[in-house]
From Swiss-Prot:
Membrane topology: Multi-pass membrane protein
Lineage top rank: taxon: Eukaryota
GO cellular component term, pick one: plasma membrane
Identification of the protein by name: XK-related protein 4
Record keywords, A-Z: Apoptosis, Cell membrane, Membrane, Phosphoprotein, Transmembrane, Transmembrane helix
Bias kind Polar residues: ranges: 21-31
Chain's gene name: XKR4
Annotated Low complexity bias: 216-238
Residues found modified as Phosphoserine: 200
UniProt feature, compositional bias: Basic and acidic residues: 1-15
Pfam families per UniProt: XK-related
Native organism taxonomy: Eukaryota, Metazoa, Chordata, Craniata, Vertebrata
Main location: membrane
Family statement drawn from the similarity comment of this UniProt entry: Belongs to the XK family.
Site (Cleavage) location in chain: 567-568
C-alpha cells in the first residue's frame, strides 16, 4: 500500500489561513485546519452508523443541516464564507445543537463505572481461561490444555502488538508535532512557517522534520500535523514547555515496553482512560474538552482492542469448551464459568465498541447506557444460540463442522464484498478487509456500511436461523445413542428460544432505544428535512456579484496549480479566503477552528473509520490554544454548501 507523505503544517497570523493535510493524498485527500475568524458550524442530522456506531477516534463527519439560527457556516467558497443570517440557519458540517451538546458533556460517574465494568469483564474472561487451562494440565488432559492456552496466548499477543504499535505511532507523532511547534515561532508576533512531514520538495524557508507513518489492518493511516492560529507566541511557549527530554522519553518507552511484555497493555489503557476522564473534570474550561476528547479517543482504542481479543480468543474458546462439555457429557463448574465469561465478553465487546464509536463522532448522538444494555442482551442471546448450535454439531461432525465454517465464511465475505465497502486504497486491500470482517459474521452481525441496515439485518438473521435449524436438526438425528431426549430436546429449546430472545431485544433497540428512534430522536427544532430549504445568507453576502466569486476562485486556482506543479499531483489543498469583513449589522462570528477533509463522509463505515480517525486525532488535539474543539467538515458538506451559495448568489 503506497502512501504518499505530502503533509504540511503552516502557522501564520490570524488573518491568514492555516491548514494541515492528511498524509495520504492518493487515498484520503487533505485535512485543513482553518484559522479563527471562520463561522461556527451548523448542523448535521443523524443516520445509522456502521459498526453499530461511528468512528473511533476523534472524527466527526457530517451532513449539511441548517436548523439553528445564527450558527454560521463553514469556510465557504467564492468569498461568501457561508455565513448564516440572523433569521436563517448556517449551512455547515455538524449540527450546532448536537455539537454544542457534545462540548458541554462531562465525564460522569457512570462513565467511570462502565470502564471499571469492562475491566472486570476482561479479567473474568482471561482469568477463567487461564485457570481452566491449568486445571486441564493438572488432570493430565494435555490436548485440551494446549488448545485452551493457545487461544489465550493468541488473543493476548495480538492485542499487545496492536496496542504497542499504536503507542509508538502516537508517541512519535506527538514528539514531532511539539518540537515543530516549539521551533516555529522564535519571536513573539513573528510569522511562522513550519512544514512537518516528508514527501515532496520543501518550500523556501521551510523545515521538514519527518514523522513516522503508521499503517494498520487494511487501512491507510497517516500522520497529521496541526496548527494553532492567532496565538503564535503563546502557542510556541506551551509547545516548548511540553517538549520531553531524552531521559523522560526513554523512561516512557521503557515503561510501555514492560507493560506490553507483561501483557498488560489493554489494562493500562483502561486505567489511562479513567485518568483522562478525571483530569477532564478537574481542568479548566479551556482544557476540559481536550482531556475529555483524549479520554474518548483512548476508550475507542481500548474498545477496538477488546473487540479484537474477543474474536481471537473468547469466540473460539467458547466453542471449544462447549464441545468438550458435549463430548464428555459432564459439566464442571469451572467450565461453565469459562463459557459464561467468554459469552459475556463477546456481547460486551460489541455493545461497548458501538458506544465508543458513537461517542467519538460529533455528528452522531451518543447511545444511552440503557440502549447499550439492550444491545448487550441482543448480542448475548444471539451469540449464545449460535455457539451452542456449533458445539452440538461439532460434537458429532468434527470434519463437516470445519467445512461448514469455511463455507459460511466464504459466503459472508462474498456478501460483504457485494455491499461495496469503500475504505482501502486498492481493490485487493478492500477484499482482504472484507475477509477479516467475514470472520466476525460467523458469530454475530456487524455493520460494515453506513445507511439503513434493515434489509441487511433481515437477510443475515434469516440465514443464521436457517443454519441454526439445519445444524441442530442434523445433530438431533445423528447424536450419540447415550444422549437421551431428556437432554436433546431442552438443548434445542435453548437454541431457538435464545435466538428468538435476541431478535426481540434487537427490535426493541431499533424501535425504542436507537438514538435516531422515536424515544431519543431529534427534536422538532433540530430536524431538517431539506438543508436547502433553510439555507439563507446575509443580505450583504447574498447580493455579492459573480465577478467577486470568479476572482476569488481564480486566486485559489493559481495557488492550487502551483502546488500541483511542484508536487506532481492533483492539488489537495483548497483553502478559500473568506469574504472581507465590512462594517455592517452582521452578528460577530464565533472564532473557531475548522478541519476540512477532502473525503466523502458516508463512504467510511465505523470499523474502518477507527483507523482513519486515529490519524485525525493529532490534528484535533494539536489546537492547544483553541478555546473550543475544532470542527470537522467533509467533502460532501462543502459540495452542498458551494451549490447553495452559488444558487443564492445568482
Amino acid at each position: 500500500m503506497a502512501a504518499k507523505s505530502d503533509g504540511r503544517l503552516k502557522m501564520k497570523k490570524s488573518s491568514d489561513v492555516a491548514f494541515t493535510p492528511l498524509q495520504n493524498s492518493d487515498h484520503s485527500g487533505s485535512v485543513q485546519g482553518l484559522a479563527p475568524g471562520l463561522p461556527s458550524g451548523s448542523g448535521a442530522e443523524d443516520e445509522e452508523a456502521a459498526g453499530g456506531g461511528c468512528c473511533p477516534d476523534g472524527g466527526g463527519c457530517s451532513r449539511c443541516c441548517c436548523c439553528c439560527a445564527g450558527s454560521g457556516g463553514s469556510a465557504g467558497s467564492g468569498g461568501s464564507g457561508g455565513v448564516a443570517g440572523p433569521g436563517g440557519g448556517g449551512a455547515g458540517s455538524a449540527a450546532l445543537c448536537l455539537r454544542l451538546g457534545r462540548e458541554q458533556r462531562r465525564y460522569s460517574l457512570w462513565d467511570c463505572l462502565w470502564i471499571l465494568a469492562a475491566v472486570a469483564v476482561y479479567f473474568a474472561d482471561v482469568g477463567t481461561d487461564v485457570w481452566l487451562a491449568v486445571d486441564y494440565y493438572l488432570r493430565g488432559q494435555r490436548w485440551w490444555f494446549g488448545l485452551t492456552l493457545f487461544f489465550v496466548v493468541l488473543g493476548s499477543l495480538s492485542v499487545q502488538v496492536f496496542s504497542f504499535r499504536w503507542f509508538v505511532h502516537d508517541f512519535s507523532t506527538e514528539d514531532s508535532a511539539t518540537a515543530a511547534a516549539a521551533s516555529s515561532c522564535p519571536q513573539p508576533g513573528a510569522d511562522c512557517k513550519t512544514v512537518v512531514g516528508g514527501g515532496s520538495a520543501a518550500g523556501e524557508g521551510e523545515a521538514r522534520p519527518s514523522t513516522p507513518q503508521r499503517q494498520a489492518s487494511n487501512a491507510s493511516k497517516s500522520n497529521i500535523a496541526a496548527a494553532n492560529s492567532g496565538s503564535n507566541s503563546s502557542g510556541a511557549t506551551r509547545a516548548s514547555g511540553k517538549h520531553r527530554s531524552a531521559s523522560c522519553s526513554f523512561c516512557i518507552w521503557l515503561l510501555q515496553s514492560l507493560i506490553h511484555i507483561l501483557q498488560l497493555g489493554q489494562i493500562w489503557r483502561y486505567f489511562h482512560t479513567i485518568y483522562l476522564g478525571i483530569r477532564s473534570r478537574q481542568s479548566g474550561e479551556n482544557d476540559r474538552w481536550r482531556f475529555y476528547w483524549k479520554m474518548v479517543y483512548e476508550y475507542a482504542d481500548v474498545s477496538m482492542l477488546h473487540l479484537l481479543a474477543t474474536f481471537l480468543e473468547s469466540a473460539p474458546q467458547l466453542v471449544l469448551q462447549l464441545c468438550i462439555i458435549v463430548q464428555t457429557h459432564s459439566l464442571q463448574a469451572l467450565q461453565g464459568f469459562t463459557a459464561a465469561a467468554s459469552l459475556v465478553s463477546l456481547a460486551w465487546a460489541l455493545a461497548s465498541y458501538q458506544k465508543a464509536l458513537r461517542d467519538s463522532r460529533d455528528d452522531k448522538k451518543p447511545i444511552s447506557y440503557m440502549a447499550v444494555i439492550i444491545q448487550f442482551c441482543w448480542h448475548f442471546f444471539t451469540i449464545a444460540a449460535r455457539v451452542i448450535t456449533f458445539a452440538l454439531f461439532a460434537s458429532v461432525f468434527q470434519l463437516y463442522f470445519g467445512i461448514f465454517i469455511v463455507l459460511h465464511w466464504c459466503i459472508m465475505t462474498f456478501w460483504i464484498v457485494h455491499c461495496e465497502t469503500e475504505f482501502c486504497i486498492t481493490k485487493w486491500e478492500e477484499i482482504v478487509f472484507d475477509m477479516v470482517v467475514g470472520i466476525i459474521y460467523i458469530f454475530s452481525w456487524f455493520n460494515v456500511k453506513e445507511g439503513r441496515t434493515r434489509c441487511r439485518l433481515f437477510i443475515y438473521y434469516f440465514v443464521i436461523l436457517l443454519e441454526n435449524t439445519a445444524l441442530s436438526a442434523l445433530w438431533y438425528l445423528y447424536k450419540a445413542p447415550q444422549i437421551a431426549d431428556a437432554f436433546a430436546i431442552p438443548a434445542l429449546c435453548v437454541v431457538f428460544s435464545s435466538f428468538l430472545t435476541g431478535v426481540v431485544f434487537m427490535l426493541m433497540y431499533y424501535a425504542f432505544f436507537h438514538p435516531n428512534g422515536p424515544r431519543f430522536g431529534q427534536s422538532p427544532s433540530c430536524a431538517c428535512e431539506d438543508p436547502a430549504a433553510a439555507f439563507t445568507l446575509p443580505p450583504d453576502v447574498a447580493t455579492s456579484t459573480l465577478r467577486s466569486i470568479s476572482n476569488n476562485r481564480s486566486v485559489v486556482s493559481d495557488r492550487d496549480q502551483k502546488f500541483a506543479e511542484r508536487d506532481g499531483c492533483v492539488p489537495v489543498f483548497q483553502v478559500r479566503p473568506t469574504a472581507p469583513s465590512t462594517p455592517s449589522s452582521r452578528p460577530p462570528r464565533i472564532e473557531e477552528s475548522v478541519i476540512k477533509i477532502d473525503l466523502f463522509r458516508n463512504r467510511y463505515p465505523a470499523w474502518e473509520r477507527h483507523v482513519l480517525d486515529r490519524s485525525l486525532r493529532k490534528a484535533i488535539l494539536a489546537f492547544e490554544c483553541s478555546p473550543s474543539p475544532p470542527r470537522l467538515q467533509y467533502k460532501d458538506d462543502a459540495l452542498i454548501q458551494e451549490r447553495l451559495e452559488y444558487e443564492t448568489t445568482l
